[in-house]
Amino acid sequence: MRTSGRAVIIDASSSGASGDKFLGALIDLGGSPKSLDKVARVVEDNLPGASHVHVKATRVERGEISAQLIEVRSEEKVSKRKASDLQSSAVKCAKELDLSEWGTAFVKSVLDTLSSAESRVHGHSVKEVELHELGSADTLVDIVGTAYLADELELSGARWWCGPVGVGTGVTEFSGRTYPNPAPAVAEILRSHKFPMKTSNIQFELTTPTGAAIAVNLADGKAGEIPIITPHKIGYGAGAKNLDEIANILRLTIGELSGTDHAHDEVVVLETNLDDVSGEVIGRAVERLMEAGARDVSITPVFMKKNRPGQLISVISDKTKSEHLAELLME
């Protein structure tokens, strides 16, 4: 549990969230572009089918605000990957980059969020779901890069908050089809995490699935109400497109929590009885629940009907993750 008085506020209310905007804002806060070069090399080495992965950082203006634009380029020999394959590559990247315990858990949780949303939208199991654009090298660079830069900036011990996430209207295209904004995966991520959403009249994909997944996992249940902080540093990440209506940026503000501001965590306890289940199955269930963001999982021996021995599995979860964890618990 993070107890530092240091806080990071994510402002994605006007122009949404995307992986490249998060990377840009972290670079603007002082992260090294060379760190992203390192992340790109590690992703290329550990993601089968990806080659020539490069990252370019450029200072640009969005609505007369100076911001960092991050562009990820790669060549792909495959058009889609299973979510489980991307997760496996991500774990290897985290290990090679020596991510902190928080960073490694964050990477896993973001990918779990993406695969869970895609599986619900398309009606496939998490194990069977295949990622198209979301399975590319740039998705992995966005997620692993965010964790790596947060570690570098010593933000892994900070408490993160996020206001409402801005989403556009109109339509967006991917996988050769047209979908309404926000994209179905974005809507599902925000719904399942009970995250506030702010709809604008801008006909553009302001928030991407990767951006939404990063935001909900960084905020870790702390969404909507922003605490009182003393700001110390501000970073701006630029979106790829320069929009006429708004400054297409994401803002990260680092500060200290006010001494009069007391943050309270709300948790949910999920429990179910298990009967005639092997220890191996229970062990794997505990592992999956922890990887998906449970705060704690415990197993208690109990007597069931007719004095049959069984187990009570108890899961402590943040409110925003409780629905997803309940679904895993029932699988």
What residue ranges belong to the model's regions?
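Conserved phosphate/anionic-ligand binding catalytic regions in large, soluble enzymes, centered on
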Residues: I9-L26, L131-E154
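Glycine-rich nucleotide/cofactor/substrate-binding loop typically near the N-terminus or early
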Residues: D28-H122, A183, L190-M197, I202-A212, ...
